[in-house]
């Protein structure tokens, strides 16, 4: 089916272009969401009549989207979740969680505007793209951690797989175990010469 695009559609075309798409995509997505018109002679004439209005509305919406993008751009969102010692989350961080975190900061975006390939299932940082307008995109950094302290350590770039206190305790335990099993250290403590 041929359609006339009423706005820019990613990987398809710009506003005003006549493109050929599959019937299901046209009916279920483009026409339903008023992103396109069927490319009939009547609709082509109708589009030419409303072209100036559509372009003016697009420029206005793009300007508003640019203002919102400035607020969002480079923002760091922290999401606290329970996770195993290996960093696997007990659950996941989805688009809904990102939208809710932005809403808590006073920024309103809808779920379809957040582009997340798959839910986040591990602790760490991930860049997420937000398309506020078909021509305006920005990104945020989502930091997933077990606690606020751990989130700060992740932001600083520290290795969070093991804590520094745990590494120090392990080194002390190895040193103590080495003395415990060293026969010379045991004999010196007992005051006896080493038997050979």
UniProtKB/Swiss-Prot annotation:
Signal peptide: none annotated. It comes from the Bacteria. InterPro entries: Ribosomal_bL9, Ribosomal_bL9/RNase_H1_N, Ribosomal_bL9_bac/chp, Ribosomal_bL9_C, Ribosomal_bL9_C_sf, Ribosomal_bL9_N, Ribosomal_bL9_N_sf. Keywords: Ribonucleoprotein, Ribosomal protein, RNA-binding, rRNA-binding. One of its GO terms (molecular function) is rRNA binding. GO terms for biological process: translation. Gene3D superfamilies: Ribosomal protein L9, C-terminal domain (3.10.430.100), Ribosomal protein L9, N-terminal domain (3.40.5.10). One of its GO terms (cellular component) is ribonucleoprotein complex. Belongs to the bacterial ribosomal protein bL9 family. NCBIfam families: L9. Binds to the 23S rRNA. This is Large ribosomal subunit protein bL9. It comes from Bradyrhizobium sp. (strain ORS 278). The lineage of its organism: Bacteria, Pseudomonadati, Pseudomonadota, Alphaproteobacteria, Hyphomicrobiales. The gene is rplI.
